[in-house]
Structure formats: C-alpha cells, structure tokens
Amino acid sequence: MSDYRSFGSNYHPSSQSRKISIGVMADSQPKRNLVPDKDDGDVIARVEKLKSATVTELQANKKEKSDLAAKQRNSAQVTGHVTSPWRSPRSSHRKLGTLESVLCKQTSSLSGSKGLNKGLNGAHQTPARESFQNCPISSPQHSLGELNGGRNDRVMDRSPERMEEPPSAVLQQKVASQREKMDKPGKETNGTTDVLRSKLWEILGKASPANNEDVNSETPEVEKTNFKLSQDKGSNDDPLIKPRHNSDSIETDSESPENATRRPVTRSLLQRRVGAKGVQKKTKAGANLGRKCTEQVNSVFSFEEGLRGKIGTAVNSSVMPKKQRGRRKNTVVKCRKAHSRKKDEADWSRKEASKSNTPPRSESTETGKRSSSSDKKGSSHDLHPQSKARKQKPDISTREGDFHPSPEAEAAALPEMSQGLSKNGDKHERPSNIFREKSVEPENEFQSPTFGYKAPISSPSPCCSPEASPLQPRNISPTLDETETPIFSFGTKKTSQGTTGQASDTEKRLPDFLEKKRDYSFRRESSPEPNEDLVLSDPSSDERDSDGSREDSPVLGHNISPEERETANWTNERSMLGPSSVKRNSNLKGIGRVVLSPPSPLSKGIDKTDSFQHCSEMDEDEDEGLGRAVALFAMALQNFERKLKSAAEKKSSEIIASVSEEIHLELENIKSHIITEAGKTSNLAKTKRKHAETRLQEQEEKMRMIHEKFKDDVSHHLEDFKSTIEELEANQSELKGSIKKQRTSHQKLIAHFEGGIETKLDDATKRIDSVNKSARGKMLQLKMIVAECLRDD
C-alpha cells in the first residue's frame, strides 16, 4: 500500500461512501502569476470538499460493477462533482475508455454549428482534464511574461506542454521540489492547488502501478485541440470566449449546464465531462479562428488536431482492461468517421483516390490518413497561420522550461522504458504514461532505423506522444516489412540559418546510422502533388514518437546538445502550423517524398522566449526550401546506399566466384586423391588374389596326387583281402574233411569199447552169484551148528 494514500482509504472504513465523480481536472487553468484571481478565494473551501469527497470515492471502488454503474448514473445528476487530490486513483483510470465515443458524438453534433456556444462561460468549455494536465510540476510559479509572453491572464497555462507528463523518476524530483515550495509562507492559492495536483500525481505514480491509465497523460485530442484553440484567444478576445479563471484545477468540471444533458448514462463522469467541455471549447475556437493571440491552447475538437487525439487515446490505453481497450478501439473508429464526414468534397475525393491507389495498409496508417485530412480541413478554417506560428512560440519555451527532466532523471527512467511493449498484440494500443513506482514509459511506435526496435520515449508530450500519425505505420514488426519501410528518423537542427543547421546536424548522425544499419531505406510515397518533396511530421502525429525515440535511442538521442534539442523543438512546433505543412501532412502518397521525423521536444527548456519569437518569424518558403534540401540530401543518401549495395553485390559475386573456384580445385584434388587410393587398393587386392589362387592350385595338385595314391593303395589292399578270404575258405573245407574222418574213427572206437564192457559185466555177475551161493551154504551150516549147540545145552 502506498504511503500517499488518502484518509478516505481502505484503512479508514468509517469514512463516508465516496461519490463516483471523477473530477480530477477543473474547467479552467490555475494562474501561474503571483497575483491571485477573483475566483481564488474558493480554493480553501473547495479543498475541504475534495478531502471529504475522497472518502466517498475510495469506498465506492470496492463495490461491484453494477453498483458502480448505478452510482455513475446517480452522480451524473450532481452539479458539484468534486474529488480529492489525495484520493486513490484506482477508479479514475478505468473510466477513460469511453472518452472517444462521447467526443465523437459531440463532434458530430457540432460539425455544422461552429461558434454557437459563445454564450457559455469559457470555464465550462475547457476539457475536464485540461487544467490538471496543464499544471507543470517543476515550476509552479512563473512570471506572467515567461509563461504566456504577454497574453491575457485568463488563458494562461493552456499550452500542450502543460499537459505533458514527465517520467516517474522525473516526477519524484519535481514532486520533491513542489513540496519545498509548499512549505513557503508566502505561497499563493494557486501554488496550493499545484501542491494538491502534484500530490495526486505522486499518488497516481505510487498507488496503482497496474491499473493506472495516467490521468495526467492528456489525450492527444485534448492536447492538440487545446493547442489550436489558444491561437484564437488573446488579450483582446471576446469576454464570452475567455474561460472564467478558477485557481482550483480539479473542482469545477461539472458546472456547465450542458453537462447533464450531454452525459450518457452508461459512461463515466470524467469522460462525459471531457466530451461536453471539449465540444464547447471547439465551438468557440471555430467562432474565433481569425483572431490573433500570443499563445495557442488546444481544444478537444480543433479541426486540425482533434482526430489524432482520439486515435492516440486508443493507442495510449494498453494498460486498461481488455474490455475497455476494445471499447476504446471501436470508439476511435467512430471518431474517425465523424471527422471524415465533415471534410469538404475535394479533400474527401483526394483521400479516396489516394486510398484506392495504395495497397491496404495497417489500421493505424489509415487512421493517420484520416487525421491528416482532418488537419487539412482544420487549416482551411485557420485564417492567419503565420500569426499562429508567432503565437505558439512563447508557450513552447515555457512548456519546455517547465517539463524538461534532468539528465539524471532521464538516465534513471531510461532502463524502465523498454518495459512498455504491449503484450496483447494490439499494435494500435500502447501503454499509457502512468505515474507509478516502476514507471513504464510509452513506447515509440516508430521502429528505430538503427536497431530495428520500438524505442520508448522518455516523457509523454504533445510532440512525442504515441499518437496515430499519417506518416508512419503503427504495426511495424521488429523486422522491416516488405511493403512498408520505416521512416528515416534523424534530428534536425533548425535555426535562423535555415538548412545549414539541419544539414550539419543530420550529417553528424549519418555515419553512425549507416554503420549500424546500412541496408535501411527511406520511405517514399506517391503523392498527387509532385511539388512537395518533403513531409515534416507535425508534433501531434506519431512522428513525435519517433522524435522521442531519438532522444532515448542509445545512438541518436543522447548525443544531442540541449541547444540542438531546443531548436529542434521549435522546428516541431513550427512545422505543424503553416498551410503548406498541413497540406503536406494530408498528402501521404507524395512522389519523391521522404518522411522525416523531427526530434522530441523533451529536452532542456529555454528560459527566454526571444529566440523562439525570432525564429517564428521565418518565412514558410524557408521551411519548404529546407524540406527540399533535406529531401535532396535524402535522395543523395538513397543513391549512395544504392551504390553501396551494388558495390557490395559486385564484391560479393567476386568473392563467391573465387571461393567457388577454390572449392572446385580442392574438389578436383580430393577426387584425384580418391582415385589414386582406390587404384592402389584395387592392385593390392588383385595381387593377393593371384597369390591365393596359386596356392590353391598347388593344394589341389597335391590333393589329386594323394587321391591317386590312395586309390592304388586301396586296390592293393582289396586284392590282399580277397586272397586272404580265399585261403580261409580253403582251410575251412579241409577242416571239415578231417573232422568227418575223426568222427568215423571215434564211432568205431566206442563200439569196440561197448562190446568189451558187456563181456566184463557178464563175468562179474557170474562171480557174484557164485560167491553168494557159497556164502549162503556156509550160513546154513553155521545155523545148524548153532542149533545143535543149543540143543546140546
């Protein structure tokens, strides 16, 4: 949470419910002189109202979108819409998305009624954000002569540079200096208002780094149209056209009686207030186009610059939610159509013819064309362009003196500039210049010719804000497109000497440019007016982006002295004014033209306006002569580039031929070497093959001899075997005969034996029988003897 939160914040829930009045800006500008105006007595009471309204604003931000829309409709009916300079900026930045639709509707309604609102108070016709934008931070108090160069007090601080917004690093230093001036006892009432405004800026830079769309970043329509309107206001102006001065810059933004009728119910109050008051201021500007004055103040609907402002607003909104970004983009288209319908028939037919002759380009380029056409129409209403040029110069000096950041601040803010690339792929929407803790600077849509990237600009200003330009495409890829070559951007030092300063300054940067990107080509476009050789972009277009990128570019920007940048700033402002310049801006397809972007005005301010007043009296013919001289110089550069390319191509062809010859010779050497090696290998293989074949033949011969010998041996062995078998057979037959003989003999022997045995057995039997008989006879005798013996007993 930021240290700069108001008392009516989330930490104080007991505070009142806040209104949805986004009255960050007031209708009239705070006076820069030391003499308080008659309305300065209201400051104290208004500041008290602002503090009380802060509580209501912070609490209503927590509610849902439905409640927020309801409160917006209710707050549209409140006459006094006050906001606090101490409030949190979370609500105001979300409500800027539909500003262009309101402005477009107001423009359409006022297209045929210029000068009808003269009766309204001028304070109610100032854009709602004008005074807040126009308050410089570094120098809240200046003498009347320094600020407006003799113009009336009531139209002070309405220069576009008052709407500038320094980077975050520069902001902190200027806020610190502002605080020191707050402590001075003799500080005037408008100094208090400046303190409040600077405090709000500091809150915007610290409190919401993610959701802020910087309120101080004046939409280009407000910047440029306010700048144009100041041409028609002077010390002798009609009192009805002079805005009623009010030192409080953030209070009286809803006092106009037309605000209630012109506010759409669905739009935020801030955007509605900006639209209504911008329409009124533009009407007054149209009614006083012929008047002379000493300073130019842009109105929201100035015919020269209003359309670009709307386009730039859409470009400057990439940090908003996607829904609002898409809505803003659609609104931008409506605004372009509204302004295109107001063009006269000649300009319209010329634009249609040029569009039919040119291939389709990006939407941003078409937007730039419409813007330049609208610029041309605006210049037709400008009856005194050269007097405007004189009236413009004092404001430039004062604005640059007020808003130039110190070199240390630029160096501190530079590392953060590269973070500004839009990541949603929408090249028509660029980050707004937001005051937050890590400042994300708006990127320069112009592609740097040196490095091929989109260089960020160090500070938003009317001369370097990322607006739609008719002179350069917005959808430039990191690599150069085939159909759209980038615009050659180099600084021009335009002094009273004319073309000498610019040529010297250009030639001083040229070697570095050619060294870095030699193949860079100038952008040449066809034009129905062949007399116009050069188009110098006016500060309200996207060329100011490329101007800002030159100061921040590592190669081109930081080598420029403050005097060069001061004179270059004067060149930017002056190139916007003359009818020939406006005509050149509307002719986007000029034959033989080179589009150059002057350097950024964000440089060291000039304290005195005498040099600018002297330079503002230079004739427009000198400007055209300078343009032609620079165009011729650019053509010479283009021819030199063509010669360099042809020489490079010739040298490249020679190198390629020599290299190809060397490659051919080396190839032949390699081929012969390969053939030699292959022959050696083939011969060696043949020799080895022959040797192997010889050995194989010898082995075959030996095998054949062995085979023959084997056959002989086998036959011999077979014969031996046969003879042996025959012998065996003979022996067997002989054995059989002998065996047969032995058998016969044996049989005879056995028969003889059997006959002898039988005889022997018969004899033995007979002997046994005889023995037995003898034994029985003896037994009988014994028995008889024994018997006799027994009888005798």
Swiss-Prot record:
Span of the signal peptide: none
Q: Per the record, where are the segments of Polar residues compositional bias?
A: 7-19, 72-86, 131-142, 209-219
Q: Which spans does this entry mark as compositional bias, Basic residues?
A: 322-341
The UniProt entry's GO biological process terms, in alphabetical order, are: meiotic cell cycle; regulation of synaptonemal complex assembly
Q: Where is the composition biased (Basic and acidic residues)?
A: 60-70, 151-165, 177-187, 221-248, 342-354, 363-385, 392-407, 424-441, 505-527, 541-553
Give the compositionally biased regions (Low complexity).
Answer: 110-122, 455-470, 491-502
Keywords recorded for this protein, A-Z: Chromosome, Coiled coil, Meiosis, Nucleus
Q: Where is this region: Disordered?
A: 1-40, 58-97, 110-287, 305-586
Q: What is the superkingdom listed in this entry's lineage?
A: Eukaryota
Annotated GO CC locations: chromosome; nucleolus
Residues annotated as coiled-coil are 682-745
- Iron-sulfur: present as a keyword of the record? no
Q: Where in the cell is it found?
A: Chromosome; Nucleus
Q: Does the entry annotate any disulfide bonds, and if so which pairs? A: none
Q: Which InterPro entries match?
A: ASY3-like, ASY3-like_CC
**Whom does it interact with, and what assembly results?**
Interacts with ASY1.
Provide the function of this protein. Answer: Required for normal meiosis in male and female gametophytes. Acts with ASY1 at the interface between the developing chromosome axes and the recombination machinery to ensure interhomolog recombination. Required for synaptonemal complex formation during meiosis.
Mind telling me what this protein is named? Answer: Meiosis-specific protein ASY3
Species: Arabidopsis thaliana (Mouse-ear cress)
